[in-house]
Structure formats: C-alpha cells, structure tokens
C-alpha cells in the first residue's frame, strides 16, 4: 500500500485548521500529521517531522506566509498550497507566493468561511494531491480523490450543430491551456513574446477574482497586452485574453473576425474555466488556423480538445515532462494522439514566434 501524503496545516484560524483537516481526512490517501497557528510553531514542529505537503495562510502573526514560504523553499523545498483570502491584498500576496514557489491556490472568503470550505472539500483534496506530485525543480527554472463530482465533457457547453472549420487563412491564433504550475509557466512564455505575436486565448485553472489581477500583473511584465477576457472581445495580434475564473471561454467567428464568448455553465472535467471547452471551440471555428499548446497541470482537461484541434488541422504542442510541475494534462493529450510535438518550457515562446512568422 502506498504511503499516505503527510500534510501540515498552518493557519491562525482554528476554524480553518479544523475544516481543512476534516476535508483532507475524507481521502484515505492523505494524513494530516500536524497543525500550527503560525509559522514559528510550524518550524518547531517541522524539526521533528517534515510534511510532504504544506497548506498555509498568507496573513499570520509573528511571521507572514510569504516569508515562511521563502524560508522553506531555501532550506527544504516542500510542495505548498496557499489558502488565501479573496480580498485584493490577499490576492496580490498570493501571486507573490506563487512566484516564491507555491504550487496552487485555495481561496477562502471573509464571510461564510465554514460552509465555503466544506463545499470546497473536493478542491482542497485535489490541490493537496496535485501538490504532492509537483516537480519543484520545474518551478524554479495517481490515485482518485475520495470525493467525486460528476465529470462532464465540453459537450455541455458547446453547440452540437454542424460547422465547417475554416481552411487555412492568414488569421492565425494560439490557444493555451494549463493548470498546476501554470501561472509561472505562462509568465515564462508570455514575457518572451514580441508585441507582434499572434492573438492568444488562454485557460488557466484559477479561482474567480484572481484572473483579473493575474492578467494585470502579466500585462505589466509583457510586451504584448494581457487582460482578462470579456464577452465579445476580438482576438487580435499582440493581445492575450485569459478566461475569467468561474466562467468558460469559447472561440466564435463573427464574420471575418475571431471573438470570445465568455459564459457561465457547469464544471467541465471538474473545472470552470475548462481547457477542453476552449480547445474544442478552437477546433470547431479555427481549424487549421490555430496553434494549440497544453502545459503543466494535473488531470486530463484539454486532452480531448487538443485531439480535436489536431484532427481539424491545427498544429499542437505539449510541454515536456522535465519542465512540467505536474505532467498530467500534457501526458493525457499525448496518450490520445493529439500532440504533434513536445518541447521544454523555454522553447515554447520561440515556437509561438516561429508560428506567427510562418503565417
């Protein structure tokens, strides 16, 4: 029998510690071995027993979560999940934590905390399982969860009417899908693109209200414009549109232009936004005029959509295992036969630029 994933929860709220521990206890493959009310107590306990995964808050007494995380990553790199407030200050600190090496985010509201965390128990379990599989070396350069949601396909969001994909034209676009480790991977890719890069549509699995700040942060770092997508936005050269957290994003055709349709809907592959929803819509409306890229992430969201893009004539790329934080989504896309080429993260910007020049 495989060893259990040993978890330490560090949060100054006794309620958060209790509810997160209860959620994790529902998975027989996870064991909460320690809890601590602040990083100082946590460091003392970690001298005796080091966890496989940390779940930590950002704002804590005596030492904040960012300082704690940086100390841990310098001394003994450990997969870490951030449990942060949805408040703007908390969200900004969360991106700093992701940059410092945290693997993923669990959001918590200021009001209705207990009921929210109970409802999000599956997300908590998934985040810890994903973190336990993380390749932390990729950040710096498979059991099923006990609680299952119905796993819907992208058919639930996409119309079933016939539509002939366009023959290859000069209107090219790039579609990117990613999850765990994706915030760092997207930054590494987008910051290396020139302002003349093809139009880009992106799904990054991320909680609601975080995507706008994430896009704003990237926009300040990139030559291209980066922003959270709005319904009806045109896909234009030099612009990257990121699907809003909690909403699906689909490509549509409006006359001679590509536009995005941002809409609510069910969880697809247990995600909203879903990479499959985006990729399958790109296959349907762009066909051979698209480049699809699937990057680091746990699970199989995007694998079917990439296969449909490939079959529609699009060029497809998967990030390779060595540079992925979690080699899940790319692996599943490769298994389905939907990937033309695999490459390390550092080569993806060049592939996008080369694709744009070939158009």
UniProtKB/Swiss-Prot annotation:
What is the active site of this protein?
179, 205, 301
Q: What's the catalysed reaction?
A: [protein]-L-glutamate 5-O-methyl ester + H2O = L-glutamyl-[protein] + methanol + H(+); L-glutaminyl-[protein] + H2O = L-glutamyl-[protein] + NH4(+)
Q: Which domain of life is it from?
A: Bacteria
What EC number(s) does its UniProt record assign? 3.1.1.61, 3.5.1.44
Keywords in UniProt for this one?
Chemotaxis, Cytoplasm, Hydrolase, Phosphoprotein
What Pfam families does its record include? Answer: CheB_methylest, Response_reg
Keyword Phosphoprotein listed? The answer is yes
Q: Does the keyword Cytoplasm apply?
A: yes
Gene Ontology CC annotations of this record: cytoplasm
SMART domains in the record, alphabetically?
Answer: REC (SM00448)
Top enzyme class, one word, equals hydrolase
Q: Where is the CheB-type methylesterase domain?
A: 167-359
Q: What is its main location?
A: cytoplasm
Annotated ranges, domain Response regulatory: 6-123
The family database entries (PROSITE patterns) matched by this protein are listed as: CHEB, RESPONSE_REGULATORY
Q: Which family does it belong to?
A: Belongs to the CheB family.
User: Its biological function?
Assistant: Involved in chemotaxis. Part of a chemotaxis signal transduction system that modulates chemotaxis in response to various stimuli. Catalyzes the demethylation of specific methylglutamate residues introduced into the chemoreceptors (methyl-accepting chemotaxis proteins or MCP) by CheR. Also mediates the irreversible deamidation of specific glutamine residues to glutamic acid.
Name the record gives this protein: Protein-glutamate methylesterase/protein-glutamine glutaminase 2
| Gene name of this polypeptide | cheB2
